[in-house]
C-alpha cells in the first residue's frame, strides 16, 4: 500500500470518517473562505477555490454552506480572519510530519501542536527541518472497477506525471500546476475520481511497529482532531499485520 494514502485507509478501517464529519465540514469551510479571500470568489479563475468546492461536493456539503463561505471570504459577510502556516516535526520512530494549520490565534495553535507532538513521543522542529522530504503533487484516486490501461493512456495524454496500480485503487499523480487540467480531461473521458486533491507525497517511508505505530496513529488522530489543523502529512508505513494487532 502506498504510504501517502496509508492514513486515509486506516481512518476508513477505524470507521472514523462519519464520526468526524462535522470537523471535516468546518475545515472545508475555512479553506473555501481563505481561498476566496486570496483569489476571488470565481472558481473558474481560482484553482484553489475550485479544489475546495470539489472537496465540499465530495463530502455532500450543502450548497448554502459553500456560498456563505465564499461570501465571507470576499468580504460580503462578517467573519473570522485566518492565518495560514505549516509546522514541522518528528513523530515516533523518526518519522517526518508536516502540519498545515489555519488559525485565528497562532499562539494557541503552536502550543496545541507542540503538546500533541510531545505527548505522542515526537517533537516539534524548526521550519524546513522535514519539508524537503515531501513533494507537492496533485493526487487523483480511482476505483479498481475501471480499465487501468485506458485510465493510464488518458492520464498521460492529459499531462499526468504517473499512474500507479495500488492495492485497493489506482492513483494518478500530477504536477500541482497541471492538476485541474488532468482532472477536467479525465472527467471528460468518463473517469470519475473517488478523491482529488493537492497533497504532500513523502519521498521515503519509515516502517513502524509496536508502540511507535500506536503513538503514530495517536499523533495523526489528535492532530486531525484539532480545529486549527487543516492537513497533516507523515512518512510512516504500518503493515496490515501490525494494524490487525491494534484494531
From Swiss-Prot:
Its main location: cytoplasm. One of its GO terms (molecular function) is DNA binding. InterPro entries: Integrase-like_N, TACO1_YebC-like_2nd/3rd_dom, TACO1_YebC_N, Transcrip_reg_TACO1-like, Transcrip_reg_TACO1-like_dom3, YebC-like. It is found in: Cytoplasm. One of its GO terms (biological process) is regulation of DNA-templated transcription. Keywords: Cytoplasm, DNA-binding, Transcription, Transcription regulation. Coiled coil: none annotated. It holds the Pfam family Transcrip_reg. Belongs to the TACO1 family. This is Probable transcriptional regulatory protein GM21_0933. It comes from Geobacter sp. (strain M21).
